[in-house]
Amino acid sequence: MTPRRSRVKRRNLRKPKMRFLLVNRFTLLLLLLVSPTPVLQAPTNLTDSGLDQEPFLYLVGRKKLLDAQYKCYDRIHQLPSYEGEGLYCNRTWDGWMCWDDTPAGATAYQHCPDYFPDFDTAEKVSKYCDENGEWFRHPDSNRTWSNYTLCNAFTSEKLQNAYVLYYLALVGHSLSIAALVASMLIFWIFKNLSCQRVTLHKHMFLTYILNSIIIIIHLVEVVPNGDLVRRDPMHIFHHNTHMWTMQWELSPPLPLSAHEGKMDPHASEVISCKVLHFLHQYMMSCNYFWMLCEGIYLHTLIVMAVFTDEQRLRWYYLLGWGFPIVPTIIHAITRALYYNDNCWLSAETHLLYIIHGPVMVALVVNFFFLLNIVRVLVTKMRQTHEAESYMYLKAVKATMVLVPLLGIQFVVFPWRPSNKVLGKIYDYLMHSLIHFQGFFVATIYCFCNHEVQVTLKRQWTQFKIQWSQRWGRRRRPTNRVVSAPRAVAFAEPDGLPIYICHQEPRNPPISNNEGEESTEMIPMNVIQQDASA
């Protein structure tokens, strides 16, 4: 036989094989499309008038399951034959997951699938291959069986952990509201504390207050509502939508069943829940962008050394209150059109990047602001010829003071560890930082501020004097009554006051309603002050 005839013959032999593979794949795809899914049968009480009337979870779960089933059959045909020794169980699709060839007497493990809201993907599924090279059969049904029982086993430990996180959120946001309201009253009553920096603080404090109120309403009204929670595809989601973790574990969704349908989108509780979620997304975005405003202002004062009162706050107002409404509206419209679950709570959609993308950009920018600010602080401290250890101690203090204000913890710890112990530590750490962040910010930037403390002590002393005079016990005023602008001069040299007051020499002093000169507050005591200030 000539070489040419040999090549033609081999080519002709390949054609039937290629046709067989093409026909086989086409038949497989056709069967997947037309055959009913074995584990997600449509509920009998639903009509076939359209997909809109099918359960929302059924649509989401069925799509994921069909994708996994197609990939499994394709994998079964693509993988080479088993190369091990001895008996083994054949690769198979068990109806939910794909299993490779497994040696006899061994147990295969995989993470639980995410088809169902009550499945914990951190848990494991197991499938046993017996000594005869056959997959384990359940004694009751005599059918091959995979152990999915751990996927939705809500143990007492998980439930207790969920309740701890739930009450941690309630306590944290309640304390934050109380501390922030008290701080706002202090800044509003004592006019000698007024300056541009405090004005920015007030707006950021307001976003914390409103956001905490919305979250408390959500925890009290939405989380206990089983109809809303169980019919939404909920998954653990940690960062800014942190409360969903508690919601998912406290009210675990039911498996797909006949009553598991999408609620009426025009129902009052569904509409109110979506409005609440819209407000939460907006206030959360405002919170982070006011953090960005604080970072821009600090960077302008310290790095660019601009101490003038001419900074126009309207640009900060536009960035803090105006810009976040744009991604929030876009997210609401696209969510209603393309992923309209009951309360827009699901994290199983990339539409969340419309909200989280700008937030992450703001956090990253603030992170670089922090690094640059610390660099400038260290440079200034070196110029003062301080001891090296003390210099870095002050730099660390300055860094830790700025972290809760600028939200840097979300950049430093962006992902939850997969390890169970580390994951639990991460949960408690991040939930404490998130829920108590308003309390921490109010404490650091108001209650621990030296000038605020001096002002409050002076007011308390004046109150005691007036009280004594009212009851006839007149006392001579003590020398503890000092003016707020001069109080900074008595700060301890090893302290780190958050604000340093200075008066712009180019501008005349402006008297407020208490007859005192207004002051501007500059962060960090590393900025040199005029001795006569």
UniProtKB/Swiss-Prot annotation:
Paired cysteines (S-S): 72-98, 89-129, 112-151, 273-343
Glycosites: 45, 90, 142, 147
GO CC list: acrosomal vesicle; amylin receptor complex 1; amylin receptor complex 2; amylin receptor complex 3; cilium
Localisation per UniProt entry: Cell membrane
Described function: G protein-coupled receptor activated by ligand peptides amylin (IAPP), calcitonin (CT/CALCA) and calcitonin gene-related peptide type 1 (CGRP1/CALCA). CALCR interacts with receptor-activity-modifying proteins RAMP1, 2 and 3 to form receptor complexes AMYR1, 2 and 3, respectively. IAPP, CT and CGRP1 activate CALCR and AMYRs with distinct modes of receptor activation resulting in specific phenotypes. Ligand binding causes a conformation change that triggers signaling via guanine nucleotide-binding proteins (G proteins) and modulates the activity of downstream effectors.
Assembly, per entry: Heterodimer of CALCR and RAMP1, RAMP2 or RAMP3; the receptor complexes function as AMYR1, AMYR2 and AMYR3 receptors, respectively, and respond to amylin/IAPP, calcitonin/CT and CGRP1 ligands. Interacts with GPRASP2.
Name of the protein in its database record: Calcitonin receptor
Taxonomy of the source species: Eukaryota, Metazoa, Chordata, Craniata, Vertebrata
